[in-house]
């Protein structure tokens, strides 16, 4: 008697929202056929705060802290996109030293993000040592954030027209001294994970994304580079002073989780290269000077000036009560954030507040393909794939 039972149906389980491998407040509804994933249904919006609407009611200066709270793993990279958009509309050029400080801190943010991703990726598949080493380095980087802006995470350090304040020379020297020991830590992580048999079994040929599909789904950043395209906005559409920096773009060939891991490891080394060049340029005579534009309609005057000049005092008062009036127009500015292309589409109507600020978060496009990538994989592979997409919920839900 070998009749098939009639009522075979797939098993549905909840993954998250409080699952340790769910990276924040993700809820996945998984439809399983045995242990094979038949369907993935991501439920988002658990961290939605209406950021885009809130920005419409704030001046351009007050809008900056909202960007720290999107991808809160690498905050300054988001502020960068918003400031670039506003600067395009205002038609202002950031002073050289301001550009170098921005690039330096954006690369620190990239390392912060990749360290977290690579080490938690290892933790998701069962390795417990990498996160301990990685977080030790992240701690040092957060101290650099704190010494520049007073805050470890939500820095609000970038300004329209430059950065809030200059870096002390001691801080620049300390960042330079940090570079060499950090590369040794990356090598240690490399030795621990790259050739590790278990790590490879969990990541090689898992979550393969062919290049054609990566473009179709709107992927960017590591997700397209892992599939073999040398697409990096820092090279293809250089902004600030990236055009004069010498660095390489690592690309993968298989488009699987393992290639994406290798790319993030190599990108950390390239970021250190860029940081070294920034520090060298900051220490050179032409790297000295103002860090924010001298135009008092956009940036506040110096304290000493305000004590002497009534006009400077009025400028300061107007700037912080009313804010800067941005000429009407619309603009799209994108930066190569650690997760991918982070874009800001800004519509100004000539007032002191943005008319509309559309945020293009890279993680959103990556998460929407979760169903497509996971089908046919085992349940245990879901957390490995999710980790390699590098999703942070602040920017997905915004």
Swiss-Prot record:
Gene3D superfamilies given for it?
Cytochrome-c3 Hydrogenase, chain B
Keywords, sorted A to Z:
Cell inner membrane, Cell membrane, Membrane, NAD, Quinone, Translocase, Transport, Ubiquinone
| Keyword Membrane in annotation | yes
Coiled coil, from the record = none
Q: Name one GO cellular component term.
A: plasma membrane
The protein's matches in HAMAP family, at most eight in alphabetical order, are given as: NDH1_NuoD
Q: Which family does it belong to?
A: Belongs to the complex I 49 kDa subunit family.
Question: Mind telling me which PANTHER family this protein's record contains?
Answer: NADH DEHYDROGENASE [UBIQUINONE] IRON-SULFUR PROTEIN 2, MITOCHONDRIAL, NADH-UBIQUINONE OXIDOREDUCTASE 49 KDA SUBUNIT
Its protein name is: NADH-quinone oxidoreductase subunit D
Species assigned in the record: Bradyrhizobium diazoefficiens (strain JCM 10833 / BCRC 13528 / IAM 13628 / NBRC 14792 / USDA 110)
Name the gene: nuoD
